[in-house]
A protein has these predicted regions:
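Active-site-proximal segments of metal-dependent phosphoesterases and phosphodiesterases across multiple
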Residues: 12, 154-217
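Active-site environment of divalent metal-dependent phosphoester hydrolases
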Residues: 13-18, 52-56, 84-97, 157-158, ...
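N-terminal active-site segment of His-dependent metallophosphoesterases
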Residues: 1-61, 69-71, 75-78, 174-177, ...
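Active-site neighborhood of phospho(di)ester-bond hydrolases with catalytic His/Asp-centered motifs
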Residues: 8-10, 43-50, 78-86, 188-192, ...
Length: 420
């Protein structure tokens, strides 16, 4: 197998009484997937949660829909990977009170507590057994790749879940550690919620384990809009690809993803397809973010790119070219005056000596150190006036403050500063 390909659906929200718009979209979805996959081998299909709407019936229509996707993609039911979402559980007063108590006291999961929370997924589990002819596992090992399934909805079920989901750490760890010896395989984690919906301390543990047990990227849904994100907290870059909704409504972006990965280079792409409601057809697009403006986004597995890192470390720096760049930048700068600049000059190494950062950031910082003497030489030369020297830090601070609230991570901040 040279390439790994998959279809990613999410939040399909079957309710049993769909109107024209939803039926029209779903029928067209099947046709579009058939068109895309007609001359390609698809290895698996992902449905990242919310199969039904508000714990509605897992009826014949839902079963027929999933079976049709399986048949179109020419895969077996064993290659259909599904996780539950917050709509796939039964909300009740007992669950609400239990969750409120757990979140308030941050208690350790006891056996009885976990069993009570599991009961609310009974209808979902029964349906999965019917559709796959087996009980659902958390880990599926296939030649060349592995699928790790997470029930991120385990502690969902209130109107205020975001940032409050709690990880059942023992169950999570017992399963993910089975990937410890899978360094040579591609390892994909699948859940319903973005990781940021967990408690902050749980987020850190999830990324640490993703890093230590060879997870390469994470597929999810829930937000009803296509998107992506990158995490470096665990020590290396792990992407998240967030599929949009599979149900037409007033605010959702209806999307599905097609993923492709070269198993030799460990590089590939994810293409997003968006449903146009008025035109009633599919087009490429629907993934938010500058890197996906063309409708597709590059997929690179950081864990396998050691040779690329070595090339960056050995890259020669053209000092004359870098000087010219800085001087051209300075000519275009709009000077910003500050009557009371509150800047306390410090040596750059002193500034960074006490900072805590992961290995990837530290490594990237060290590759940039070679530029510092050049920048100092320019800043201390007679080519810049005192006003110009003082303006540059103020401009950087000003532009940073402008975009700080509009970006979700450091990379986006830099991109927005450069654009401005």
């Amino acid at each position: 197998m040279e390439k790994l390909r998959w279809i990613h659906l999410s939040d399909i929200h079957f309710s049993g009484n769909e109107g024209y718009e939803i039926k029209r979209m779903r029928d067209s979805l099947a046709d579009k997937i058939k068109e895309i996959t007609d001359d390609k081998i698809i290895n698996f299909v992902v449905v990242s949660g919310d199969l039904v709407y508000q714990n509605a019936s897992y009826d014949r229509q839902l079963k027929s829909f999933l079976e049709s996707i399986v048949n179109i993609c020419n895969i077996s039911k064993e290659d259909l990977f599904i996780v539950p979402g917050n709509h796939d559980l039964k909300r009740n007063q007992t669950r609400t009170l239990l969750l409120e108590g757990i979140r308030k006291d941050n208690v350790k999961f006891e056996q009885g507590t976990a069993e009570q929370l599991q009961k609310d997924f009974r209808k979902y589990r029964t349906f999965i057994k019917k559709i796959k002819n087996q009980d659902q596992n958390y880990l599926y090992k296939v030649t060349g790749y592995n699928i790790f399934l997470m029930n991120t909805a385990f502690t969902a079920g209130t109107d205020d879940d975001e940032g409050k989901l709690i990880l059942e750490k023992n169950l999570f760890y017992d399963e993910i550690k089975k990937l410890k010896d899978q360094e040579k395989s591609v390892n994909i984690a699948i859940g319903h919620h973005p990781i940021k919906h967990f408690l902050e301390e749980n987020q850190e543990k999830i990324w640490n384990n993703f890093n230590d047990y060879n997870i390469d990227f994470y597929l999810c849904g829930h937000v009803h809009k296509g998107g992506y994100n990158y995490d470096l907290d665990g020590g290396r870059l792990i992407p998240t690809y967030q599929c949009g909704s599979g149900r037409v409504d007033d605010y959702a972006t209806v999307t599905f993803f097609v993923g492709e990965l070269d198993l030799k280079t460990k590089k590939g792409k994810i293409i997003s397809y968006k449903w146009l409601i008025n035109e009633e057809c599919w087009t490429i697009g629907g993934m938010d973010g500058r890197k996906a403006t063309t409708g597709e986004i590059e997929l690179v597995l950081d864990r396998f790119q050691k040779e690329t890192d070595l090339e960056l470390e050995n890259m020669e720096v053209n000092e004359d070219e870098f000087r010219r760049f800085i001087m051209q930048f300075n000519e275009k700068v709009k000077y910003i005056s500050d009557k009371n600049p509150n800047i306390d000059p410090k040596d750059v190494f002193e500034k960074f000596s006490n900072m805590k950062c992961n290995k990837s950031v530290e490594k990237h910082y060290e590759t940039l150190c070679k530029y510092f003497p050049i920048i100092n030489e320019i800043m201390e030369s007679t080519l810049l006036t005192i006003i110009e020297r003082e303006s540059i830090p103020n401009i950087v601070i000003s532009e940073y403050n402008k975009v700080l609230g509009k970006a979700s991570n450091g990379s986006e901040i830099i991109e927005k500063i450069v654009d401005s």
